[in-house]
Amino acid sequence: MYPPNSSKSTAHDGGGDADTNQYDSAAGATRDFSSLGPQTHHHPPPQRQQQHQQNPNLVGHYLPGEPSSIGFDSNASSSSSLFRHRSSPAGFYDQHLPTDPNGTGFSLGRPNGGYGGGGEQGPSRLKSELRFSSGSSSHQEHNSLPRISEVEAAAAARNGVASSSMSFGNNRTNNWDNSSSHISFTIDQPGKRSKNSDFFTLETQYSMPQTTLEMATMENLMNIPEDSVPCRARAKRGFATHPRSIAERERRTRISGKLKKLQELVPNMDKQTSYADMLDLAVEHIKGLQHQVEVRP
């Protein structure tokens, strides 16, 4: 791929033939570009060196088949066979390419290369075209990307429009890509929603139910007893399952039964008295009964 030093020395002595050999050694004697066009053989003309010198706006030297802008430097010394990367100067696209102050559209052209012989001018190198324009040419209609109407969206938002629409399309009708797709979406502007929609949302959330099932549910909830007190739900008394709780409950049950019998036997015993007073009254009642039995001989 790198041309030898002998070919460069021959280029200074032999003229056009040596330049042709140098170009063939760098790019290859024959190339088959059947995907780009009809299969032809490459016959480079001797005017390649002059074309580079006459075109001052050329950015780098493009070799056939090279995807990047890295080319062979013809002004380099004969002792060096390295490749030099050349980038465009500052402000190159602003000066040499047309710009559109009102639009943001740009077009990307596919690389084109034609190789022919006979009366045709020399081979056109593979290159990518980057153009910023807003014209209505046939090339832009097929290879240009549609602009996003940001200015129109901002103007519509200022005029009180609630939402703006943006669409992206790819309607290329060439042999490279026959598929077409269209994607569209809508963006709601913040703070521009109507008050009617908010009021309808609040009314739906806090208004009375409308369906029959909801009405029946509300009636069941409204039928609350007047004497009921809202309290925390708790377990009923006497339903503890722990063994100690069960034993204590049984003991209290036996004591309550005995006191009831004692209340039946002892007169003038108030039910609100304590257990100690009830036992004292029971003992006094028993002593009185014993004294009556002893008096009756």
UniProtKB/Swiss-Prot annotation:
InterPro entries: bHLH95_bHLH (IPR045239), bHLH_dom (IPR011598), HLH_DNA-bd_sf (IPR036638), IND-like (IPR045843). The keyword Phosphoprotein applies. It comes from the Eukaryota. Keywords: DNA-binding, Nucleus, Phosphoprotein, Transcription, Transcription regulation. The modification Phosphoserine is found at residues 35, 138. Homodimer. This is Transcription factor bHLH129. It comes from Arabidopsis thaliana. The gene is BHLH129.
